[in-house]
Amino acid sequence: MESRIGDTAPPDNHVHTEWSWDAAAGSMEATCSRALELGLPSIAFTEHVDATRWVLTGEAQSLMPPDRVGVDGRFDPATLDVDGYLACVERCRDRFPDLRILTGVELGEPHWFADLSRALLRSAPFDRVLGSLHSLHLDDGPWLVDHLFWGSAPDGVTPDEVVRSYLGETVRMIESSDLFEVLAHIDYPVRGWPAANGPFDPVEFEDEYRAVLRALAGSGRVLEVNTRLPMPPEIVGWWYESGGEAVSFGSDAHQPSLVGHGFADAAAMVESHGFRAGRDRFDFWRRRP
């Protein structure tokens, strides 16, 4: 488990609790306690908002909540209970006055569900809005990207093609949706990269990564350094070279023990590539002049 990070710890702007459909081990109160132990200045509870009905086969079905798998074998993510979530945030703000607690959502594929996403954002004031891509349309429907590496992908789809398709769709998401401020986990496919293919090398996909980063920088938005896995440092370097102005740190924790995971190493890496703490402890990290 992480030890106290210290006074220079960045905020954790990507955290899930029991209010996200895939965080059965989540607890907002326990996560707040852990954030204070680590010395985090603030935390953003960015709960999932997903509307994509994913194709599931074999092992993938067994890993999902069974009550959400339809008779057609597709998965229907549960809807966020906005009122219950906001009430829980207020209880935690009262209980943990020394921790700045931000509201937030992680919009899955917001460019595919613009009306739903816009209506959700109008329903309540959210401090942090992440845009994320978890899915790709292949053959008979949308597939979770990490599941495509498990041998259940349509015939002929290779790991390299999954990564390139993912990054191409991420460009389309940035260019066609202005509903989010922070791009979450640009390296999401790395989570499922097959060991048989050797270590993941981002340089093999440099052109595709740079296309995403140029689009994001041109829109004035923020790149997340997601610490679920160590971010390939090349990506942060390309972000700086693309004119990116800001970085957000997110553990993507789905249980309290993982909040702030990997932040000390990630902060050192980000600083070595030209970014530093912003205007105050609660700000994004900003590009050095």
Per-segment meaning from a language model:
Residues 1-111, 191-202, 211, 250, ...:
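An N-terminally biased module of ancient metal coordination in phosphate/nucleic-acid-related enzymes
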Residues 19, 107-111, 123-126, 131-242:
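Domain-core and long-helix interface of multi-subunit machines
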Residues 24-34, 111-120, 165-174:
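Short, acidic/polar
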Residues 94-99, 242-243, 275:
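Short helix-capping segments at alpha-helix termini
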Residues 97-102, 215-223, 246-249:
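Short, surface-exposed connector motifs at secondary-structure boundaries
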Residues 228-264, 268:
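Extended hydrophobic/aromatic segments used for targeting, binding, or gating
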Residues 261-289:
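Mid-to-C-terminal alpha-helical segments outside catalytic/metal-binding sites
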